UniProtKB/Swiss-Prot annotation:
Its main location: cytoplasm. This is DNA replication and repair protein RecF. The RecF protein is involved in DNA metabolism; it is required for DNA replication and normal SOS inducibility. RecF binds preferentially to single-stranded, linear DNA. It also seems to bind ATP. GO terms for cellular component: cytoplasm. InterPro entries: DNA-binding_RecF, DNA-binding_RecF_CS, P-loop_NTPase, RecF/RecN/SMC_N, RecF_2. ATP binds at G30, A31, N32, G33, S34, G35, K36, T37. Belongs to the RecF family. NCBIfam families: recf. SUPFAM superfamilies: P-loop containing nucleoside triphosphate hydrolases. GO terms for molecular function: ATP binding; single-stranded DNA binding.
Amino acid sequence: MSLTRLLIRDFRNIENADLALSPGFNFLVGANGSGKTSVLEAIYTLGHGRAFRSLQIGRVIRHEQESFVLHGRLQGEERETAIGLTKDKLGDSKVRIDGTDGHKVAELAHLMPMQLITPEGFTLLNGGPKYRRAFLDWGCFHNEVGFFTAWSNLKRLLKQRNAALRQVSRYEQLRPWDKELIPLAEQISTWRAEYSAGIAQDMADTCQQFLPEFSLTFSFQRGWEKETDYAEVLERSFERDRMLTYTAHGPHKADFRIRADGAPVEDTLSRGQLKLLMCALRLAQGEFLTRESGRRCLYLIDDFASELDDARRGLLASRLKATQSQVFVSAISAEHVLDMSDKNSKMFTVEKGKITD
C-alpha cells in the first residue's frame, strides 16, 4: 500500500496540513526546525501510535492544544483504506479504520509496514540488545500471524513472574507462570531464529553492495544457553533470579549481533559506514517482506545527506528506487535530493510548520 493522502492537525509545530502524496518519492525540504521531520514523525505515529523523537505525549501535541489528529488514505492494489489516529494529553488514543472506531494500533502497524532511517538510528548497531530485538520482532510481526499475541503474552507473564520472585521462597511456587511462559518463549525464539536465517542472504547481498570492503557476519543469540531447554534454565536459575528479582534468561535477553571482519561493527566502521550498514539492513528487511508477502514497505528517511558522500547517496537512492516503494525523504537543501527526483516525485517546502508543494 502507499499513502496517498495525509492530514495533520496540531502535531508538533504543524497546525493544519493536507498533503496529496506521490506513490514514489516525496521530498520534504526546509531549514532545521522548520517542521520537515515532524511530517515524517506524523507518518510514523500514524502507523505506530507513538512518535519516534519523544515518548512524552505532551511534547508531540502542538502548544496549548489538547490532542493531535492524523488521518491517511492508503491505496492498495484492489482497494483504498481510510485510517485515523487521535491522541490526547492523557495518552488516550482512538484508532479509526474505514470509518469505524475501536481498532488497535497493531492494526495500523500491519497496514503500514515502514522502515525508519534517522541520524539517531545508529542505536540499531551500537545500542543495547533491545534495538536489535526490535529489528527481529518487526520482521516476525509482519511475517508470523500469531507473533504479536504471543509477544504481548510473554511481556505480561514476565512482568507477573518478576513480581512473584519478590514473594516466593521455592521454585515450585513459580511453576504456574513457567507453565505458560516456557512454550511462549520457545515459540518466539523459534520465530526469531527462522526469521534471522531467512533474511540472512538478503542482508549479506545488500551489505556486500553497500560495504564490499568488509566481510560481514550475522548471528542470532536467543537469550539462554544453546542446546538447553528453557525449563531447565528457569529452574536452575531460580535462586539467582530471586536475588535479582527479575528473570535473567529468556527471549527478552536475545540479541542479533553483526560483525565486520570478525570484530563488532561498532568498533570497526566509521559513522558513514555505519549509516550505510543501517540502510542496508532496513532495505533488506523491506525486500524480504516484499518477496515473502508481496507487500511493500514505506521508507522514512530523515536528514538524507548526513554522513553520506555523493556516491553513497546515489547508491542508496538507486536501491530505494529499485524497491518500487513509497519513500519520504527530508533534507535541508533541494540540491541534496534533485538527482533522486523524477516525473512522479513530489517536492514539499516546509517553513515554520507550513507545508507547500
